[in-house]
Regions:
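Nucleotide/phosphate-binding catalytic cleft detector across ATP-hydrolyzing
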Residues: 1-65, 84, 108-110, 114-152, ...
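Residue-level signature of catalytic and energy-coupling elements of molecular machines
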Residues: 33, 68, 101, 166, ...
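Short, ordered loop/turn segments at secondary-structure junctions
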Residues: 45-49, 81, 90-92, 117, ...
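Gly/Thr-rich phosphate-binding beta-strand-loop-beta motif of the actin/hexokinase/Hsp70
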Residues: 55-86, 101
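A conserved active-site cap/scaffold subdomain adjacent to cofactor or substrate pockets
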Residues: 91-115
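Phosphate/pyrophosphate-binding loops at sites that engage ATP/ADP/AMP, CoA/4′-phosphopantetheine
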Residues: 163, 167-182
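Glycine-rich phosphate-binding/hydrolytic loop that grips phosphoryl groups
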Residues: 211-229
Length: 229
């Protein structure tokens, strides 16, 4: 029952989803903001804040999963019948893609991040094998060139693994392939070329990039600064 107000009954029960956090980490975050002269009116779980910004009421009613691709973690929020029914966080994120590129191309982390942002793609088959990247122009200590397809192959392996985490979690709660409104991607890596197609392929669900409301601010790294009422 969505709204029991005014109804007659003999017993009222509720299923609640409780979000907790590591207290020292929360206190440290608050202290940093206050030390910088900022004021905190409240705290909210990141993926939950993102879902309030980019998901429509219709999507939440139909059934939708929001995948928040962060630097070090991936957040998953699942909605059905207008309610948040599941949350999960996975200890893998965009930084893992960068690390894989650094190892695979034998370049610095900084150069790997630059290559990911400038030449990266999520689906290797969509990238030409003859397109070459001069590694030394990005990292003076590097040698030779790398094809964009090879770069995409490295990235695709890690991104497919990330979607496997998400799909396994959806299977665990019985929602894999069963969310009519599909998957909405947000976060710094959400607009990577080919990522939507890879998400559709791995999750077997309609997929799209979440677009925030105008009152929110999209930061340079693709994260959201969200104004919540």
């Amino acid at each position: 029952i969505k709204d029991p107000l005014g109804m007659v009954g003999s017993r009222l029960e509720v299923n609640s989803l409780i979000i907790d956090a590591f207290e020292p980490a929360v206190k440290s975050l608050v202290k940093v903001v206050e030390t910088a002269g900022g004021e905190i009116s409240g705290l909210i779980f990141g993926p939950l804040a993102s879902s309030q910004s980019v998901l429509s009421k219709n999507q939440k009613d139909l059934g939708v999963a929001l995948v928040d691709i962060g630097f070090g973690t991936i957040g998953l929020s699942v909605y059905e019948e207008g309610k948040l029914v599941h949350l999960a966080v996975f200890p893998v994120g965009a930084s893992n893609v960068t690390n894989d590129l650094a190892i695979g191309l034998k370049i610095s982390i900084e150069a790997a991040e630059a290559i990911k942002c400038s030449f990266g793609a999520a689906l290797a088959k969509e990238v030409g094998s003859r397109e070459l990247v001069d590694l030394q122009k990005i990292d003076p200590r590097a040698k030779g060139t790398a094809s964009r397809r090879f770069i995409a192959e490295i990235m695709e392996m890690r991104l497919a693994e990330i979607f496997e985490f998400v799909n396994n979690e959806l299977k665990r709660i019985g929602k894999a392939g069963r969310l009519p409104a599909g998957v909405v991607l947000v976060g710094g890596g959400a607009k990577l070329a080919g990522l939507i197609d890879l998400a559709r392929q791995e999750l077997r669900l309609p997929s799209q990039v979440g677009e925030p409301e105008f009152s929110n601010i999209v930061l340079p790294n693709g994260e959201l600064a969200i104004k919540l009422e």
